[in-house]
Amino acid sequence: MNLSADQAPVTAVDELAPPSQPHRLSTSCDLHPEERFSGFCPSCLCDRLSVLDHNAAPPPSSSSRKPPSISAVSLKALFKPSSSGTNNSNGNGRVRPGFFPELRRTKSFSAKNNEGFSGGFEPQRRSCDVRLRDDERNLPINEAASVDKIEEEARESSVSEIVLEVTEEAEIEEDEENGEKDPGEIVEEKSSEIGEEEEELKPMKDYMDLYSQTKKPSVKDFAGSFFSAASVFSKKLQKWKQKQKVKKPRNGVGGGRPQSEIGVGRRSSDTDPRFSLDAGRFSVDIGRISMDDSRYSLDEPRASWDGHLIGRTTAARVPLPPSMLSVVENAPLNRSDMQIPSSPSIKPISGDSDPIIIIPGGSNQTRDYYTGPPSSRRRKSLDRSNSIRKIVTELEDVKSVSNSTTTIDSNSMETAENKGNQNGDKKSRRWGKWSILGFIYRKGKDDEEEDRYSRSNSAGMVERSLSESWPEMRNGEGGGPKMRRSNSNVSWRSSGGGSARNKSSRYSSKDGENGMLRFYLTPMRRSWKTSGGSGGGGGGGGGGGWEKTAAKANSHGHSIARRVMRLY
């Protein structure tokens, strides 16, 4: 019975005791032979970990050793074998339960380099803490320098934070106890502080009242404030106007150009002259004045080389775009030959089925031109265009020809004029006579040069029908390499070779009746008369002088035509 009674409390104690862990082989370390452990030596591990801690003590020796830290104690508790099987009298196998703090389950965290034990005791940071942002911002710069400091703070906080919390709680408890003991002292102190504050507030309030009464808003202050506000407003208004000015050209019509330029004239700062040739309008822009409108035309109505009316439009027919030859004919000059009309006249040909045909001009010659056969019309149109070109070149050649002429007729005219100047009483009569002769001379010269231009620019068939045969020309005196190379009389005449022979053989008065007909008989009759009159007045040889002047005018005419045609 005693055995059963003795066994009963033993079984109860065994049930209350924790379950026994399996037996582990305990080993010892050479540096620490008195400690028993399984696995790693906790003392050696603590010594290695203490190397990272700069404030840690030197490695403990067997003779003098400081008490281990909490991390060392926790490591020893984890790695030391259980003492359920054996009871050591030294007490090294069991750790006192009161020395260890109470372990509680917390949130999971990732720890390295001894941060696990410090993270459990480190207080949670608030959201308004700025240290985290600063660390993240300066992490790439101060990472190496701040790692050691963070580790030191973590290790120190593992021990010191607990002590601080305990001391704060103790201070709070002491304050509560003192408050319970002496409540009257606190009330008296508070009442005395409130009274002092009221005394301080009263003079401040009185001072504010006095200051507000003495200082009243004056008219000057009001005016100054008004002017300052007005100045600020004016500055803002100026800025707003500048912004609007900048926005206006951006929002303008015409691809960034101001609206005033369109239809009114150019208003930009570009002062260089601009010239443009268009099929529908004529524009000359010099400086800021421009005339760019299809309604205004500077072209005089005229008949072109192909028979179309160029100039102002009519209701019956829409004109064709101007050709390249119209550039030469643009100059509105007075017609000396009186063959091309200056104003169009519409003459419809009667007929029920025939369309309306526009016939410009009012002279009989123009009507004959449009009602005649097409072959003669083609030749006459070419002659007319060439006569217009000759008039253009005549303006530039009058001065040079009058100053550099070498003919006998011109010299005789000059000598006659000098003699007339010497005789004062017969000056008016002789001057009138010689002026009439000079006019006839110029008229005949113009007609002769017109015929030359018409021959040079007409078709090859017309040229060969009115000129000598090619073998005779090649075998003649003036035949040269230029004539053999080119099959055109234009280059041959412009070069100047053989012009006298051709003139004498073609245009002499003897051959005039011998089958060589002219296009315009009236100018040729004038030339015959003037040749006879000028030959009698100047002593003969007038034909040679006219031939030289015609050759010069021919060369000048070709050069001017080339200049004008370069515009395209």
Curated annotation (Swiss-Prot):
<feature type="region of interest" description="Disordered">
    <location>
        <begin position="446"/>
        <end position="512"/>
    </location>
</feature>
<feature type="modified residue" description="Phosphoserine">
    <location>
        <position position="260"/>
    </location>
</feature>
<feature type="region of interest" description="Disordered">
    <location>
        <begin position="1"/>
        <end position="27"/>
    </location>
</feature>
<feature type="compositionally biased region" description="Low complexity">
    <location>
        <begin position="82"/>
        <end position="93"/>
    </location>
</feature>
<keyword id="KW-0472">Membrane</keyword>
<dbReference type="GO" id="GO:0005886">
    <property type="term" value="C:plasma membrane"/>
</dbReference>
<feature type="region of interest" description="Disordered">
    <location>
        <begin position="168"/>
        <end position="203"/>
    </location>
</feature>
<keyword id="KW-0963">Cytoplasm</keyword>
<dbReference type="GO" id="GO:0005737">
    <property type="term" value="C:cytoplasm"/>
</dbReference>
<dbReference type="Pfam" id="PF05340">
    <property type="entry name" value="DUF740"/>
</dbReference>
<feature type="region of interest" description="Disordered">
    <location>
        <begin position="360"/>
        <end position="428"/>
    </location>
</feature>
<feature type="region of interest" description="Disordered">
    <location>
        <begin position="526"/>
        <end position="558"/>
    </location>
</feature>
<feature type="region of interest" description="Disordered">
    <location>
        <begin position="78"/>
        <end position="99"/>
    </location>
</feature>
<comment type="function">
    <text>Potentiates primary root protophloem differentiation. Regulates roots architecture.</text>
</comment>
<dbReference type="GO" id="GO:0010088">
    <property type="term" value="P:phloem development"/>
</dbReference>
<dbReference type="GO" id="GO:0030154">
    <property type="term" value="P:cell differentiation"/>
</dbReference>
<feature type="compositionally biased region" description="Basic and acidic residues">
    <location>
        <begin position="180"/>
        <end position="193"/>
    </location>
</feature>
<feature type="compositionally biased region" description="Acidic residues">
    <location>
        <begin position="168"/>
        <end position="179"/>
    </location>
</feature>
<comment type="similarity">
    <text>Belongs to the OCTOPUS family.</text>
</comment>
<keyword id="KW-0217">Developmental protein</keyword>
<dbReference type="GO" id="GO:2000280">
    <property type="term" value="P:regulation of root development"/>
</dbReference>
<protein>
    <recommendedName>
        <fullName>Protein OCTOPUS-like</fullName>
    </recommendedName>
</protein>
<feature type="region of interest" description="Disordered">
    <location>
        <begin position="242"/>
        <end position="276"/>
    </location>
</feature>
<feature type="compositionally biased region" description="Gly residues">
    <location>
        <begin position="532"/>
        <end position="546"/>
    </location>
</feature>
<feature type="compositionally biased region" description="Polar residues">
    <location>
        <begin position="400"/>
        <end position="423"/>
    </location>
</feature>
<dbReference type="InterPro" id="IPR008004">
    <property type="entry name" value="OCTOPUS-like"/>
</dbReference>
<keyword id="KW-0221">Differentiation</keyword>
<keyword id="KW-1003">Cell membrane</keyword>
<keyword id="KW-0597">Phosphoprotein</keyword>
